[in-house]
Amino acid sequence: MTTSPTSAAKTPGDRRVRADGPDGPVTLHIEAIEQRIAAGLRPVVDGGSIDPAEIARVTASLVRDAETLLSVAEARYKDHGGQVTTGLDSLRRRLAYRRPDPRLHPLNAALCVADLARSCRTLLKLVTDPVDPHRVVLTTW
């Protein structure tokens, strides 16, 4: 697995990294992913309103990010086993779970999107940091 900045980055706030995925190179738009993670981790204020449409939009975006990052991380760590691959397997199963409907259960949906954002943050580090087969992944997986 190689990750490297790509010449495709055109603006200072548009860092991109090419990573080896299971089906070939994948370009990861780091700042865009980080912005979606930040949106998923936005605090829910007690008594404040939760916009179900916004939660649904952020959830859908983070699910796409998680699927892409997970595929790259699985390809990168497939031969290493251990804690990392156990966490990746667990996250793969969790992505298949049905999430709460934000219109019916907005607080539960907001908590789920925050959990998904934390998982994306961990995956982003796994695919952009140097490979460490002894890495212990502490997350909510």
Task: Identify the role of each PLM range.
Residues 2-31, 121-141:
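Short, charged, intrinsically disordered terminal tails
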Residues 17-29, 46-61, 83, 101-115:
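Non-transmembrane, amphipathic alpha-helical segments
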Residues 28-41, 45:
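Hydrophobic transmembrane helix segments
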Residues 40-51, 73-80, 98-105, 127-134:
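Secondary-structure edge/capping motif, primarily at the C-terminal ends of alpha-helices
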Residues 63-112:
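Amphipathic protein-protein interaction modules
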Residues 92-141:
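Amphipathic alpha-helical binding modules
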